[in-house]
């Protein structure tokens, strides 16, 4: 297998910079957006995960600009950041997805511009592995954080969602007590004893 000559061009570095700035700016906007929503306390772990994940992706792009790393390592760092930004952008398309897709596209451009010559090489395979790892971390992070519901100490509430792997679920919160159920349900009520019921589910 012939290794491709990797060239960290000025254009690739500028694109990595732009993607980094886009990612951090979107992260800041996301935190401001969530800070003004009433359900942020319930989903605090999901909000924290997304915010930290974006910081990590920005850090990967920043690290790819350091000349201490070989061009092959920079390629993998940019590929991982690009994949994470693109997939998160698709998942969050109804809120912060568009700027993330732009950042991901720019990071992808930086990745492609770093690679020259044959595409099936150890460096390109490492870049693919980095991209897959970034997506796996994103999926696992969502699966775990979405179920780490923080129930209010008093009162009752309910909600639900759909895991990327595990499928739909819904939950009940009563005076700080969390109960999970498999499947989907949009109907809930409180009986005379203060228990949550789901008629029709």
Where are these regions (language model features)?
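Canonical alpha-helical transmembrane segments
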Residues: 50-70, 110-111
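Membrane-interface helix-boundary motifs at transmembrane edges
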Residues: 5-8, 65-73, 115-124
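Cytosolic juxtamembrane helix and N-cap/initiation of the first transmembrane helix
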Residues: 1-26, 32, 59
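Hydrophobic alpha-helical transmembrane segments and adjacent interfacial helices
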Residues: 24-32, 61-62, 78-93, 110-113, ...
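Cytosolic-side transmembrane helix boundary signature
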Residues: 104-130
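Internal/C-terminal transmembrane anchor helices
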Residues: 120-146
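Transmembrane alpha-helical segments of multi-pass membrane proteins
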Residues: 13-21, 53, 57, 72-91, ...
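Membrane interfacial helix motifs at helix-loop boundaries and amphipathic/re-entrant anchors
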Residues: 27-50, 87-101, 141-201
